[in-house]
């Protein structure tokens, strides 16, 4: 077995033995009611001051929409998705392939809700291909600048491929014609990291001007995406980060932070319990080294904890419900 891969697997097993789930006094309990998320009032500004299960469930639909383009998924699995989106949202741009990766993305606009939503699904590769890619993961300089800001090469490679496909002159013109709209970026798994990278890149290229409530990032099962310097700089530009993780989701613990590759998580953790009955907002700006009585996630090799969020509303693995 490849040595880096063996080390990664040993680290997974080690963490499974020593992890525990507790909550700390600063966390905020958010009950899960399973109210139909199509009834959610999407005019609400996405922010960390107004977190609800209905809001997160609503945006999880967008994060999983891209899976509908998988040729192996029967059409009926996506019928409700399609009906849900076309009634309220206009597709501005949609892409299903890149040179490097079998990856798609969608940009919507709603004039009723005054929002743009950028959505990125996870990988459609099988687990063996993912493990092969994981062996070669490392941190690289963002934008080839030697300023200490580093991002994971695997996610950044996808980002660089799709950013010019996404931010076309027609799309930028559409932005200019709809001032004051909130930009919401969302994604699941790999797509969560790409959503963060694309958002960060758009700000640095002056495509989006950050403000108190704009833009916002909502992710589901997001892996670690950059180093601490990247996270700190990200936080100065994006004030509303909602990083949703289901307890037991092993992907949210990857890549493992090693001495020569100090991967760091964004803050804004919203920890959903394994039973999908409640969740806690853990207000911290960076990483997962909480003080006493911390929000600590358990880890499991059961992929369902990564594939299923807000069941029955969204099933990222089967995409049917």
Q: Where would I find each of the regions flagged by the language model?
A:
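Classical eukaryotic N-terminal signal peptides for Sec-dependent ER targeting/secretion
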Residues: 1-11
């Amino acid at each position: 077995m490849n040595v880096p891969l063996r080390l990664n697997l040993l680290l997974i097993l080690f963490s499974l033995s020593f992890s525990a789930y507790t909550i700390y006094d600063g966390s905020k309990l958010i009950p899960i009611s399973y109210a139909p998320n199509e009834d959610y009032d999407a005019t609400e500004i996405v922010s960390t001051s107004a977190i609800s299960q209905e809001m997160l469930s609503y945006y999880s639909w967008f994060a999983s929409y891209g899976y509908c383009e998988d040729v192996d998924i029967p059409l009926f699995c996506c019928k409700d998705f399609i009906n849900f989106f076309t009634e309220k949202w206009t597709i501005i741009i949609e892409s299903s392939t890149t040179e490097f990766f079998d990856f798609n993305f969608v940009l919507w606009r709603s004039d009723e809700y005054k929002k743009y939503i950028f959505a990125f699904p996870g990988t459609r590769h099988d687990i063996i291909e993912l493990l092969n890619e994981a062996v070669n993961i490392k941190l690289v300089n963002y934008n080839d600048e030697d300023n200490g800001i580093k991002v994971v090469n695997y996610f950044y490679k996808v980002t660089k491929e799709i950013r010019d496909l996404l931010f076309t002159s027609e799309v930028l013109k559409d932005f200019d014609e709809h001032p004051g709209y909130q930009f919401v970026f969302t994604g699941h798994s790999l797509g969560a990291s790409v959503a963060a990278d694309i958002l960060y890149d758009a700000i640095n290229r002056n495509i989006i001007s950050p403000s108190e409530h704009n833009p916002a990032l909502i992710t589901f099962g997001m892996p670690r995406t950059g180093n601490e310097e990247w996270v700190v700089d990200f936080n100065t530009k994006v004030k509303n980060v909602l990083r949703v993780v289901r307890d037991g989701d092993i992907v949210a613990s990857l890549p493992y932070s090693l001495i020569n590759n100090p991967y760091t998580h964004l803050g804004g953790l919203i920890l959903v319990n394994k039973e999908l009955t409640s969740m806690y907002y853990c207000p911290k700006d960076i990483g997962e080294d909480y003080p006493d009585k911390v929000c600590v996630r358990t880890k499991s090799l059961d992929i369902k904890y990564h594939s299923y969020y807000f069941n029955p509303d969204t099933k990222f693995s089967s995409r049917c419900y």
